[in-house]
Amino acid sequence: MQTAARRSFDYDMPLIQTPTSACQIRQAWAKVADTPDRETAGRLKDEIKALLKEKNAVLVAHYYVDPLIQDLALETGGCVGDSLEMARFGAEHEADTLVVAGVRFMGESAKILCPEKTVLMPDLEAECSLDLGCPEEAFSAFCDQHPDRTVVVYANTSAAVKARADWVVTSSVALEIVSYLKSRGEKLIWGPDRHLGDYICRETGADMLLWQGSCIVHNEFKGQELAALKAEHPDAVVLVHPESPQSVIELGDVVGSTSKLLKAAVSRPEKKFIVATDLGILHEMQKQAPDKEFIAAPTAGNGGSCKSCAFCPWMAMNSLGGIKYALTSGRNEILLDRKLGEAAKLPLQRMLDFAAGLKRGDVFNGMGPA
């Protein structure tokens, strides 16, 4: 780990006047459907299974959505994964229709990579605070001020922001890609998550200008409270997503993407884990490691209250009813301008090609041969 990271400024881009508002969050929570009873859930799942077969469709779900949807995806030959795994699965699957259970940028990414396919979502209003906090016009203006820098954006962005970028990354491959770019002597603009950008900057020593976005879920984890919880459970392994603040990341025994955290929970011999990410991941952790204990990391400080309480309200908007509606009506379809999609595909495909190269072992990642 390199601790002498170089940045042009501490935090470079002042927070623009479009932070995710409490009103937007309340509106999202208001749209979250009640959990159906067992009989209703079973009926909906049977109907959706028939519709998926009829429409030659496949369900692609994120780890953070309702466990009922995660299970349905696996039962029907679909995918449950992080955003990189979802993108790769959708691009490689032969289905005519992709039903993406996640947030809007995930549906857009699927459409960018598979413009010939129909991409449906349970709810088109399922947004992401990182996407909302990085409007294309403001981000492009920031990039225009630094034309000598390579633009790297997190996957949690709109198609328009991706089209402005040179590279798209997910948390699964961000460190490797930034290390590779640093080895080439490139200076970077990073957006939109400031915590992930700061973590990558400290780990790689890359010269990065950081946009000031954050995830409403991970931004709420508290280092002081996590330290106290860790003291109560000294035998617990702390799993931290790098969208969390530095004070939280520094307490992590494992820091990484949802897939990396899941793998650690399953493969490590310890029996107790403190989890600092969206608690939707606990469903798969408990399925794959039923003999282990998982404890939620604290999200609010003393006397404080949480906005998300470690659950993304937009992820929670995905429902079995929404999936059925999308498949029966053909609505909630992701539509993108062709030229915009083509421009956004270049940096997104660059990431997928790089990740494939890492798996083959033929990409130099800046830290030695992969």
From Swiss-Prot:
Superkingdom of the organism of origin:
Bacteria
Cofactor(s) needed:
[4Fe-4S] cluster
Q: Which GO terms describe its molecular function?
A: 4 iron, 4 sulfur cluster binding; metal ion binding; quinolinate synthetase A activity
Q: GO cellular component annotations, sorted alphabetically?
A: cytosol
Question: InterPro entries, per this entry?
Answer: NadA, NadA_sf, Quinolinate_synth_A_type1
Give one Pfam family, short name only. NadA
- Does the keyword Phosphoprotein feature in the UniProt annotation? no
Give the enzyme's EC designation: 2.5.1.72
Residues annotated as binding [4Fe-4S] cluster: 128, 215, 312
- PANTHER family of this UniProt entry? QUINOLINATE SYNTHASE, CHLOROPLASTIC, QUINOLINATE SYNTHETASE A
Q: Which family does it belong to?
A: Belongs to the quinolinate synthase family. Type 1 subfamily.
Q: What's this protein's name?
A: Quinolinate synthase
Q: Which organism is it from?
A: Neisseria meningitidis serogroup C / serotype 2a (strain ATCC 700532 / DSM 15464 / FAM18)
Taxonomic lineage: Bacteria, Pseudomonadati, Pseudomonadota, Betaproteobacteria, Neisseriales
